[in-house]
Amino acid sequence: MAPAQRPLLPLLLLLLPLPPPPFARAEDAARANSDRYAVYWNRSNPRFHAGAGDDGGGYTVEVSINDYLDIYCPHYGAPLPPAERMEHYVLYMVNGEGHASCDHRQRGFKRWECNRPAAPGGPLKFSEKFQLFTPFSLGFEFRPGHEYYYISATPPNAVDRPCLRLKVYVRPTNETLYEAPEPIFTSNNSCSSPGGCRLFLSTIPVLWTLLGS
């Protein structure tokens, strides 16, 4: 007796690709609606010198949530200039005071380093995604209606290599109103979460009742 043949339909169903999970579909939709903004971080870029006498630098980029900022480091091709004439930068994220004074010690932290001006594969590129939430412990979260600041470390010869700085404004979304810019670092004395703040406030009437009894 011939062996029974297995139905082909279940086998064909196993070969069909599975649909992506919901979070993957949301990520793809956000990527499709995002824009990319390029910044060429070198002293020859005239946008770094626009309005330099007003607030310490007029280079401003406006982005929306889920947009990308691409930083392109200085790059040199053959014939290479002398090593001392190549631009090297350490980029920091700072608060408003650090941006105005071009001082990375004003509550700033190192973000990227442009240290390969003669890289054979082209200029170094660093990308910042302006997202509300990040799954990475070392990632940074951004808020609509806020300003964020980037500067490069001031070199010893400030005449030959002026300070470069950038202001990024995150546009408010339809669900948010404009909020005044705040420092990129929050105080350790503030509540770490809305739930914790509500819990603390809810205990105040109980404490007053116990003290008055």
UniProtKB/Swiss-Prot annotation:
It holds the Pfam family Ephrin. Glycans are attached at N42, N174, N188. SUPFAM superfamilies: Cupredoxins. Disulfide bonds join C73-C114, C102-C163. Residues 1-24 form the signal peptide. It is a lipid-anchor; GPI-anchor. GO terms for molecular function: ephrin receptor binding. GO terms for biological process: axon guidance; bone remodeling; cell-cell signaling; ephrin receptor signaling pathway; olfactory bulb development; osteoclast differentiation. GO terms for cellular component: neuromuscular junction; perikaryon; plasma membrane; side of membrane. A lipid is attached at N188 (GPI-anchor amidated asparagine). Residues 189-213 form a propeptide. Belongs to the ephrin family. This is Ephrin-A2. It comes from Homo sapiens (Human). The gene is EFNA2.
